[in-house]
């Protein structure tokens, strides 16, 4: 759907398939806003395993993308040639920690965000014309994030006065709300150091094969740091959940 007034200008929606980015696309369609494509960058754990929580990845590829394409919105999927595992096992090449594996990314200084997500997006953005307009999913009740918008970025949620809760309800009504909102209020990779306890517990309970992969990485020697997040090793979290399970079984 291309604007007649600016038919040479591209309009692209950045899409994580969370509530805010999907609500942005739904609003564009509802109000006849120009929209040429949605762009999604998938971070990979390894060459075959997605970094998306499995329920969210299934929603993306089995529900959301087919639905958007039926509505006339093509979806472009970007990926880095680097995976989480590539970066985790990669060696530091300079400084006092030279030779050590990078290990778990630091909260607030995530090399995965930088190398596996931002770089593919920036590489793609360089192929676009300078006047390309980017729709971003920032709600009307997020003033700090709205203040950071650059000149080529537009929030349709702000334009149509949609809060985060409004965006969630819009997606729910349209049958396009990711199932991850049943146990979290945020998006993120299943190996994210910023993951909340409830998200980690979901991974532990429902995806033991992925949990085991993280314990394998914890056991890998020669890492810069043993901490998974700011305070704990992944094995500490595992031990805490096992203790919780044991107490529940004893109480039963």
Question: What name fits each language-model region?
Answer:
Residues 1-252:
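Nucleotide-activated chemistry modules centered on ATP-dependent adenylation/adenylyltransferase
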């Amino acid at each position: 759907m291309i604007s007649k007034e600016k038919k040479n200008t591209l309009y692209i929606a950045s899409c994580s398939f969370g509530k805010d980015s999907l609500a942005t696309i739904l609003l564009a369609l509802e109000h006849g806003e120009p929209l040429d494509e949605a762009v999604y960058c998938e971070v990979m754990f390894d060459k075959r395993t997605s970094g998306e929580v499995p329920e969210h990845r299934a929603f993306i590829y089995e529900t959301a993308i087919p639905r958007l394409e039926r509505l006339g919105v093509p979806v472009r999927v970007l990926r880095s040639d680097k995976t989480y595992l590539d970066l985790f096992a990669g060696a530091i090449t300079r400084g006092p920690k030279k030779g050590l594996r990078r290990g778990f990314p630091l909260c607030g200084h995530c090399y995965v965000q930088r190398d596996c997500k931002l770089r593919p997006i920036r590489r793609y953005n360089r192929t676009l014309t300078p006047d390309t307009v980017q729709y971003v999913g920032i709600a009307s009740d997020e003033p700090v994030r709205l203040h950071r918008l650059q000149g080529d970025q537009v929030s349709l949620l702000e334009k149509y006065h949609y809060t985060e809760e409004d965006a969630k309800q819009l997606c729910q009504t349209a049958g396009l709300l990711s199932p991850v909102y049943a146990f979290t209020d945020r998006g993120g990779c299943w190996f994210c150091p910023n993951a909340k306890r409830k998200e980690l517990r979901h991974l532990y309970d429902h995806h033991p094969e992925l949990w085991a992969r993280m314990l394998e990485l914890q056991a890998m020697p020669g890492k810069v740091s043993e901490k998974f997040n700011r305070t704990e090793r992944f094995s500490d979290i595992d031990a805490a959940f096992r203790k919780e399970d044991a107490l529940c079984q004893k109480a039963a």
